[in-house]
Amino acid sequence: MTPDPTHPHASPPAPDGIHYRACNLCEAICGLKITVQGGRVTDVRGDPDDPLSRGHICPKGAALPDLHADPDRLKTPMRRVGDHWEPMEWDAALDHVAAQLRAVREQHGADAVATFQGNPSVHNSGTLLSAGAFLKALGSRSRYTATSIDQLPHHFAGAEMFGHPLLLPIPDVDRTDFFLMMGANPLASNGSIMTAPGIRDRLKAIRARGGRVVLLDPRRTESAEYATDFHHIRPGTDALFLLALLNEVFASSLQRTAHLGGVMTGLDSLKAAAAPFTPEAVEARTGVSAGVTRELARAFAAAPRAAAYGRIGLSIQEFGGLCQWLVNALNAVTGHLDAVGGAMFPAPAFDLLAGAKAGATHHGRHHTRVRGLPEFDGELPNVALAEEILTPGDGQIRALITVAGNPVLSVPDGQALDRALGSLDFMVSIDPYLNETTRHAHVILPPAFGLEVPHYDVIFHHFAVRNTARYSQPVFPIRPDQRFDFQIFDGLVQRLTGRALATPEQRLSAGLTHGRSGLTLDDLKANPHGVDLGPLQPCLPGRLLTATGELHLAPAPMLADLPRLRATLDQPPEPLVLIGRRQLRSNNSWMHNTPRLMRGPDRCTVQLNPADAQGLEHGQTVLIRSRVGEITAPLEITDTVMPGVACLPHGFGHARGGTRLSTAARHAGASLNDLTDPTRIDALTGNAAVNGTPITVHAAEQVGESAAD
């Protein structure tokens, strides 16, 4: 779809020619070559000269022009008046929002104003480099983000083992010979907490050089096609399997700790912790045979260059924190941590750890009011948000600011949160769409985004498989009545504190100047394809930020959580549990409003193994029930999921009224999070345990034809 230049919402035309920038729609940050003719985008291709993505592009990157031209996108502030929306001028909108926030804060206290930041907050450098100052100006401890939906266990393990939440070991996939993946589907995600664009070719290259790619997952995913070995594993049992691997490593004296021996502490405690979890002890629970476990442990330990990696399937379960700790520990004790071809730490040009203090405390400094759940890195678990709004008393949340988030679809028990949002005294959303969450806002402040904004990937260079740097210039100018995200934050901060913010470009320039790469912002602007800073390099102990300067193999919180895990060995598995499903043409709840990404058959299907689908037929509508709710979805019978497992994609559920998402509404689907349970969490980290939700599946009652039919 191309914009009509006469339309009142049309953007100013872009200058004709070739434009280069990074796609910021997922973690792969692929370089793009964008052709503009007649003031509009006529072609989008992968940039072959980008040193990280090397010409790779996925369907999302090709759809960037469609997002830019989306007629449903908001560009000026909107105020809800009754059941309709009216436009506002920017100054009036910012004045009104600041006054409402100030009033709630003065009457109920700073913590009565909560914030929720969605994943796009870290995909946009303007927000990432400005939102922190806004949060500080609010002075509220009621901070919630998408982190505690799907990745908090990574950061918890990084803080406990290495001293900082952003110290996350990343697989050196381009030089490894044994890649062990668990609960990861990089063919759909393009790599997550592993920025690895073109992962298909990288996996094929491992096999081409004689290496192994081993994948364990409850579902035989798209990534399994590029694995040498695939094994089903029951949801929520990954920590048991990882302990069994460690058990075999220690029992067979396969540990290799010489290169980090003077840095690591807790080796004996880790060995003792793994002792009860023999491959035979866990095989009935995990579904992975003891023989397979022993062979994998021995082969992984013996490989000269190997990396273990666990992603979302390990994080969104009841033992996510233990899983991510054990992945790191396995790499460490086999000599594959901070080693070429193993799990390594990137060295980004703009380094968020540059000013970090060693020995800082990152969790448990305050707790939620209702359930007493601990904060981590200043954030509270999002499973508590609805109850903190709905439960009366001192500290009750009375106002909410959402930033690029749609928690009604992304947080467990979205129906409860939907009800909670309707009870707020005031809500403002910094978001370009009227979606399932922002429909509850009293004011929407839409920022410019995508092809209109300058961008540097601050976060994802910390997770990349190669050190590079790239600055993206805008393709399109914004209209006079539009605002960048940092201008919105600056306007609110000035009204709340009287102080102005530094611009993201100023902060980026300062960070680069003080970084180790020697690059300046001008250098990046002069190199539109990006700058190659080389492969990952060993960096320990210098990169560690623990109080003692050591790597902690057996942190006390992890050891204290092991009895909870051990108790599961005596518990029978649930008859049927639900897991999620990533899809290449979307990212969580994003991009369902883009027509070219929604083509083809219905993607919001529930997958069942034939053993669990007796009496049901492929394609029929089924009723799925959990403790908290029920939905209907078309049934897909497939042996790609193991028995006892149902699989449903997340991010759908666009049938709620009051939104302005015309394409998404035609592909509404059902929300997985109308089934997930906010009481199911990883007790160690507070992360939501959305995988493993017990459910039942039955044939839905016959429904009449819709009016459209």
Language model feature labels by segment:
Residues 1-252, 281, 289, 403, ...:
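N-terminal export/assembly segments and adjacent metallocofactor-ligating motifs
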Residues 35-41, 547-548, 626-627:
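Short acidic-glycine loop/turn motifs at beta-strand connectors
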